[in-house]
């Protein structure tokens, strides 16, 4: 009997539990033993591994976070640590490992694949910053969370005639700010991929004021930085009271949206099928609305392309 293990690593993302459920149930349906590794690579290093069954994944498809947990593990970044982790997997009789996470998690999976462990990577991160796939599990739920917050901030901004800077996650990738900003009608979208032009921001605010606009929403990806500096510049140049709202880790939680659940279920099912067919050391992706695979090393090295087309649309419609 084959044995497959599941590990979640890095920042949690809504949809991880739906993916865990899909992997576990596909394994059980096909007569494969399934093991859960608690607390990511740290749990692997400590042998924190248990056998899962149908009840282990009952009533989790709608839950955010990860029932397996996640934790940092500096030891696993070393060559000795990786060899130790591989040996622990072998000691537990594990034939294949499915890793749910982002770039760092995939680098760990790639390292294990090079020392004889069959691995499959599934992209789970709200940042949508993995270049080899169009979308990552958790991204659209985070966008929904941010869009809901923007709707509430629009109400209070209009009541008081204010501008509001909404800082969202995205150190190197501004997709959360871009997608939620376009979907919510933000006047300005500030992302790390585009150089900040404060005059453009303030000119939009002033044009809006002249035609009686009461609110001004500015989306800011955290990678741009300087939320309070931008606030001060806006107030100095326009005289408009400006508030800063940092959404923080609320973006990672909550019930996963339908799209994330569907993608997670499809990817989890495919991961098991690939291991059954001995097609491993791969990463699963969504490209052009299709679920595909690429070599895991390619997934780690592919650079993210910015959605210039969507950014240009945002500029045209936020006059």
Curated annotation (Swiss-Prot):
ADP binds at residues 21-25, 154, 185-187, 211, 213-215. Allosterically activated by ADP and other diphosphonucleosides, and allosterically inhibited by phosphoenolpyruvate. Its EC number is 2.7.1.11. Substrate binds at residues 125-127, 162, 169-171, 222, 243, 249-252. Mg(2+) binds at residue 103. GO terms for biological process: canonical glycolysis; fructose 1,6-bisphosphate metabolic process; fructose 6-phosphate metabolic process. ATP binds at residues 11, 72-73, 102-105. Its cofactor is Mg(2+). It is found in: Cytoplasm. InterPro entries: ATP_PFK, ATP_PFK_prok-type, PFKA_ATP_prok, Phosphofructokinase_CS, Phosphofructokinase_dom, PKF_sf. Pfam families: PFK. It catalyses: beta-D-fructose 6-phosphate + ATP = beta-D-fructose 1,6-bisphosphate + ADP + H(+). Keywords: Allosteric enzyme, ATP-binding, Cytoplasm, Glycolysis, Kinase, Magnesium, Metal-binding, Nucleotide-binding, Transferase. GO terms for cellular component: 6-phosphofructokinase complex. Pathway: Carbohydrate degradation; glycolysis; D-glyceraldehyde 3-phosphate and glycerone phosphate from D-glucose: step 3/4. GO terms for molecular function: 6-phosphofructokinase activity; AMP binding; ATP binding; fructose-6-phosphate binding; identical protein binding; metal ion binding; monosaccharide binding. It is an enzyme of class 2 (transferase). Its main location: cytoplasm. The active site is at residue 127. Belongs to the phosphofructokinase type A (PFKA) family. ATP-dependent PFK group I subfamily. Prokaryotic clade 'B1' sub-subfamily. Homotetramer. Catalyzes the phosphorylation of D-fructose 6-phosphate to fructose 1,6-bisphosphate by ATP, the first committing step of glycolysis. This is ATP-dependent 6-phosphofructokinase. It comes from Finegoldia magna (strain ATCC 29328 / DSM 20472 / WAL 2508). The gene is pfkA.
């Amino acid at each position: 009997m084959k044995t497959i293990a599941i590990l979640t690593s890095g920042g949690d993302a809504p949809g991880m539990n739906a993916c865990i459920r899909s992997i576990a149930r596909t394994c059980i349906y096909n007569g494969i033993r399934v093991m859960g590794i608690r607390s990511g690579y740290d749990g692997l290093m400590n042998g924190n591994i248990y056998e899962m069954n149908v009840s282990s994944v009952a009533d989790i498809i709608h839950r955010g976070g990860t029932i397996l947990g996640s934790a940092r593990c500096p030891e696993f970044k070393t060559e000795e640590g990786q060899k130790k982790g591989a040996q622990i997997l072998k000691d537990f009789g594990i034939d294949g490992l499915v890793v749910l996470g982002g770039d760092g998690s995939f680098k760990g999976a790639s390292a294990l694949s090079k020392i004889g462990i069959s691995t499959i990577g599934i992209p789970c991160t709200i940042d949508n910053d993995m270049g080899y796939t169009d979308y990552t599990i958790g991204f659209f739920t985070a966008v929904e969370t941010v869009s809901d917050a923007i709707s509430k901030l629009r109400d209070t901004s209009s009541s008081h005639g204010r501008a509001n800077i909404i800082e969202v996650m995205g150190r190197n990738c501004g997709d959360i700010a871009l997608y939620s900003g376009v979907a919510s009608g933000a006047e300005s979208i500030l992302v790390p991929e585009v150089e900040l032009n404060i005059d453009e921001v303030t000119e939009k605010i002033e044009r809006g004021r002249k035609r009686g606009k009461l609110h001004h929403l500015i989306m800011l990806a955290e990678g741009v930085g300087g939320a309070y500096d931008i606030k001060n510049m806006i107030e100095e140049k326009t005289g408009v009271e400006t508030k800063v709202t940092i959404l923080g880790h609320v973006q990672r939680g909550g019930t996963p949206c339908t799209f994330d659940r569907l993608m997670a279920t499809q990817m989890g099912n495919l991961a098991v099928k690939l291991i059954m067919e001995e097609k491993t050391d791969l990463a699963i992706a969504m490209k052009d609305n299709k679920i595909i695979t690429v070599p895991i090393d390619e997934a780690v090295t592919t650079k993210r392309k910015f959605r210039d087309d969507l950014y240009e649309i945002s500029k045209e419609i936020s006059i």
